[in-house]
């Protein structure tokens, strides 16, 4: 493989453990309309999908309330839910390790809350490009975001790698022809599997062990 020149990160489940925030945020939408809290299937869904699809899914049994549910979720202050998020402990160390040798980007199905997270956790300086669901016509798993990132840096898919944790991420990377590092998900079909960021520094993709001249 050619030299690694680009590392692209998913946000939820990779940069942050955000299930707690998603749980409280979407349960608040359900509670507001007098409905029971989400089950595990619904929690898994909202953890992987962007906010519009997520609200559509959790309110699928009450279609007459859907428009009101979207209006209500837009009125919620996401800062109230940040306290339920945990940054991966070695994320910053890994970012400092790979920059400036590798270009860095984010591809996420978050929307407006991504900028808030980057600012609150002082991460914006580490990422050269951020693609959210509102920046593309086709959110993940469609490859649009990754293809636009590659085009921005004038790189080929084999020169980059994507770090994700879900089936949506697996399909996203595969559709773009990019290698995948599965983060804390040993069941995901991927080129590599890790449980922490600094483990990545020892992978062949980082050490040059998989490089061909």
Regions found by a protein language model. Name each.
Residues 1-5, 96, 111, 115-213:
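Asp-based, Mg2+/Mn2+-dependent phosphohydrolase catalytic module
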Residues 2-100:
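N-terminal helical cap/lid subdomain that shapes the substrate entry/recognition surface
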Residues 107-108:
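Conserved phosphate-coupling serine/threonine residues in phosphotransfer and NTP-handling enzymes
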